[in-house]
A protein has these predicted regions:
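Cell-wall glycan
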Residues: 40, 45-46, 50-68, 72-75, ...
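Export/targeting segments at the very N-terminus of extracytoplasmic proteins
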Residues: 1-59
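Alpha-helical segment that forms one wall of the substrate-binding/catalytic cleft
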Residues: 49-116, 139
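N-terminal secretory targeting signals
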Residues: 1-14, 143-196
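Catalytic and substrate-binding regions of cell-wall glycan-acting enzymes that process beta-1,4-linked
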Residues: 42-45, 51, 94, 98, ...
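Second-shell loop/turn segments in exported
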Residues: 7-11, 39-46, 60, 82-93, ...
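Solvent-exposed loop/turn segments at secondary-structure junctions
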Residues: 28-32, 76-81, 124-126
Length: 196
């Protein structure tokens, strides 16, 4: 599987801002579409193939384990409601679509708070310290220090040249690629966290 592009994120999860979805994916799997985390045992797996990932997921689910699967770490208990099985959930676009469905529900649950929605995405609850910590980690993955004012507009005195594309700069096309040998991320109970 090749790297997940920003275009793929926008195509597969168009109702979620691409930078938000990319930050969730980075926090959850580091961009590894075959990542598995067994919440029951705390064990994380990095299968070498789709067949191995699906086989392992089926085995763990049949044993009654709660397992997070794929790019956005979709929980196995959500699969029936999402119409997915252990094979389909590892397809990057299917996984991103499922993440979109869960995040949209979390957005509604949180009353339109992104931090609350991220909390609910991770814990099922829009409030609480565990969800707040998760939300902060997702924001950090997005590189957000000071976010934009929602719905904000530039002051009238700002020159229009700032809004014009610069022809001397190539267009930005970020790509998310899981690089196991370069990734500081290692599995933990809430997704993939830093190895210290």
């Amino acid at each position: 599987m090749g790297p997940i592009t920003l275009n793929a994120i926008e195509e597969c999860a168009p109702k979620v801002a691409a930078v938000t979805m990319a930050a969730i994916v980075q926090q959850e799997s580091g961009g590894n579409p075959l990542a598995l985390h067994d919440n029951t045992t705390g064990q994380s797996y990095r299968p070498a193939s789709l067949a191995e990932a699906a086989r392992l997921a089926r085995t763990l689910i049949q044993a009654g384990h709660s397992v997070d699967l794929g790019l956005a770490q979709i929980n196995s208990r959500n699969l029936p409601a999402l119409g997915l099985d252990a094979d389909q959930v590892f397809a990057p676009c299917s996984n991103l679509r499922a993440a979109q469905v869960i995040l949209l529900g979390a957005w509604s649950q949180s009353g339109g708070s992104l931090r609350g929605a991220l909390s609910a995405y991770n814990t099922g609850n829009a409030t609480g310290i565990t969800g707040a910590r998760y939300s902060a980690r997702v924001y950090a993955q997005a590189g957000v220090v000071v976010p934009a004012i929602p719905g904000g507009i530039l002051a009238r005195w700002i020159g229009s040249d700032l809004a014009q594309p610069r022809p001397d700069l190539p267009p930005v096309q970020p790509r998310i690629a899981w690089m196991p040998e370069a990734s500081p991320l290692a599995p933990n109970g809430s997704g993939l966290g830093p190895k210290w």
